[in-house]
C-alpha cells in the first residue's frame, strides 16, 4: 500500500540515516480482539495518511489504534520519544489475573500471556504476603505486578522511570478500583533510598528489570536497605 502511493524510499537505512519507515510494530491483547499498529517513522508526517488508515481498518476491523512514533536518531533503538495517534485510542486493553490493563505504544507488557499469569501468581505464592505488609515494586512499568499484589498487602509503593508507563499505571489502578498503591516516576535506586530515608515500612521488594538487568546501583541500594528495613525471610 505504501509503495503503491509513491512514497519512494520508505525503508529506513540505518547506516545512512535515510528513508521514512523504520519499523511497523504490532501489539495485541491475548484475545486478539484489540490490535495496535505503531508506524515508526523518521518524521511526523505520512503522505496519504487517511487512505492508509482507511485501508488498514477496512481489512483489519480489530485494529483499535494506529500511532505514528517518531524516531530519527541513528542507532538500533526501535521507538522514539514522540507518539502521534492518527486513529482510535492511544492504547489497547488486555486482562491479566482478573485485572484490566491499558497498554500504550511504549509500555512494557509481557507477550506470553499464559506464562505471565503463571509467573505473577507464583510471585504472590512465594511472597507469603500479609495484609499488614508494605511492598515496593521496582521497574513497575504499567503496574501489572504491583496491582496484582495489592489485594494481598496493605500498600504497594511502585517506581518506574518511564513517564508514559506511570500514567498508564495510575489509570490502570483507577480502572480496577485499587486504592492502596502509589506510583512515582523516578529511578528505582534513587526512589528506594528516598523511601528508606523517610522511614517507610518495607516488608518486601519486587524487581522486574528491563532486558539489560538491574542497575548495579539498585542492587547495592536493595542490599543496604534490606539490613535495616527487611526481615531475614524476605531477604532470602
Residue ranges and their predicted role:
Residues 1-7, 11, 229-236:
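Single conserved hydrophobic/aromatic residue that forms the stacking wall/gate
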Residues 48-50, 54-58, 62-230:
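Rossmann-like S-adenosyl-L-methionine
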Amino acid at each position: 500500500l505504501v509503495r503503491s502511493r509513491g512514497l519512494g524510499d520508505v525503508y529506513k537505512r540505518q547506516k545512512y540515516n535515510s528513508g521514512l519507515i523504520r519499523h511497523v510494530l504490532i501489539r495485541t491483547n491475548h484475545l486478539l480482539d484489540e490490535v495496535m499498529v505503531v508506524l515508526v517513522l523518521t518524521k511526523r508526517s505520512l503522505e496519504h495518511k487517511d487512505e492508509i488508515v482507511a485501508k488498514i481498518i477496512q481489512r483489519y476491523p480489530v485494529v483499535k489504534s494506529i500511532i505514528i512514533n517518531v524516531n530519527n536518531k541513528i542507532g538500533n533503538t526501535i521507538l522514539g520519544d514522540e507518539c502521534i495517534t492518527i486513529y482510535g485510542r492511544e492504547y489497547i486493553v488486555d486482562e491479566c489475573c482478573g485485572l484490566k490493563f491499558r497498554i500504550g505504544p511504549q509500555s512494557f507488557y509481557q507477550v506470553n500471556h499464559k506464562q505471565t499469569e503463571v509467573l505473577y501468581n507464583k510471585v504472590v505464592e512465594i511472597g507469603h504476603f500479609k495484609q499488614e505488609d508494605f511492598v515496593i515494586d521496582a521497574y513497575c512499568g504499567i503496574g501489572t505486578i504491583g496491582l496484582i499484589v495489592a489485594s494481598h498487602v496493605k500498600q504497594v509503593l511502585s517506581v518506574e522511570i518511564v513517564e508514559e508507563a506511570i500514567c498508564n499505571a495510575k489509570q490502570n489502578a483507577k480502572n480496577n478500583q485499587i486504592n492502596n498503591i502509589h506510583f512515582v516516576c523516578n529511578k528505582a535506586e534513587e526512589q528506594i533510598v528516598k523511601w528508606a530515608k523517610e522511614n517507610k515500612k518495607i516488608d518486601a521488594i519486587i524487581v522486574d528489570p528491563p532486558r539489560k538487568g538491574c542497575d548495579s546501583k539498585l542492587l547495592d541500594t536493595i542490599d543496604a536497605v534490606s539490613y535495616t528495613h527487611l526481615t531475614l525471610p524476605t531477604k532470602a
